[in-house]
Structures are given as C-alpha cells and as structure tokens.
A protein has these predicted regions:
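Solvent-exposed, polar/charged alpha-helical surfaces in well-ordered, non-transmembrane soluble domains
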Residues: 85, 89, 101, 153-160
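Substrate-binding clefts and substrate-entry loops adjacent to catalytic sites
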Residues: 61-75, 110-117, 125-168
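Short, functionally critical alpha-helical segments immediately adjacent to catalytic or ligand/cofactor-binding
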Residues: 96-113, 170
Length: 171
C-alpha cells in the first residue's frame, strides 16, 4: 500500500495541471495576512542560501495552493518522510544546501515514475542525455532516473557542477 502511494501519478498530474492554471495576477482570498507571509518569507531568506523575496505573484500562488490543494500537500508531506532523508544524505555528502531537496517536490511531486511531456523522468526529472552524462543506466530494461538513490546521487553531482558554473544556488 505504501509503495502504491509513493508512485501514484495522480498527485504529479494534478500538481502540474494546477501549476499551469495558476493565474499569478489573480488575487486569491485566503486567511493568510500579507504581512505574516512577508515576515515568514523574510525569516526564510535570512536562513537560506537562496534569494527569497516577497512579490504579489508569489503570494497569489501560495494562497491558491493552500486554498485549493490542501489534500495534495498532505500527501506530499507524508511521502516526503520517505524521500527527504535520502535526498538530505546525498546533498550533505556534497556540501549542497539541504533546501535543494524541495526541487524534487516541484519537479516531480515526489513521484519516482513521473515523466514530463518532453521525457524528463524520475524524482529529479533528468532528461535522457543528462542522465547518461551523470552515469545513470538507461535502457529498455532499466531506467535509473527512477531510482531514488541513484538519481539523488546524480542530482547532487549535477547541482555541484551548476554551482561551479554559476557561483550561486539560485539556479
């Protein structure tokens, strides 16, 4: 049962659909005062290597998801208990900010079998060539882009390389 929950495509497809349909310019009514959101984002920014800034579009997206996708986020929080320790171990080994783990939430809704419309696959949404470049075995029989541990190892190496190129974590 738990394995079925971990690979359910429903939350991935729903989340991708919701992301495409969010109108960042449309004000969403939700019981989250703007000043409280600004304060929380500021505290996050102070503790993070990322640049986290308030803007009205971000507020609308956050409120939209809190209002309309509460059940989906509850499922994501449950699934994260399984995957985040794997991600954190790999990221820590490579001195990568642990916040990068949330990239997998955005990319795949934590579904190791997620496949984008352009063929990116797995938790970290590696394209075929990028997966090969980071030594993931991809064939008719196996696709390590869908292996949580191997894909996380490859994602850590990829993030290291991106940091070397760009010099910051706001990739």
């Amino acid at each position: 049962l738990w394995m079925k929950e971990l690979v359910s495509l429903d939350i991935y497809n729903d989340l991708i659909g919701d992301i495409k349909n969010v109108d960042v310019d449309k004000t969403v009514e939700y019981e989250l005062p703007t000043e409280l959101l600004k304060e929380r984002l500021k505290r996050m920014d102070e503790k993070s290597p990322f640049n986290i800034e308030y803007n009205i579009g971000l507020e609308n997206v956050i409120k939209s998801f809190l209002k309309n996708r509460k059940k989906g986020f509850e499922r994501l929080m449950g699934i994260s208990q399984f995957y985040f320790p794997i991600f954190e171990e790999e990221l820590a080994k490579n001195n990568i900010p642990l916040e990068i783990k949330y990239l997998a939430v955005v990319e795949s809704a934590l579904n190791p079998l997620a496949v984008s419309r352009v063929g990116a696959t797995g938790l970290w949404q590696f394209m075929y060539q990028t997966g090969k470049q980071y030594n993931l075995n991809i064939s008719s029989y196996v696709d390590e882009r869908s292996d949580p541990l191997k894909a996380s190892q490859a994602a850590s190496k990829y993030m290291q390389n991106m940091y070397r190129i760009f010099g910051d974590w706001d990739l």
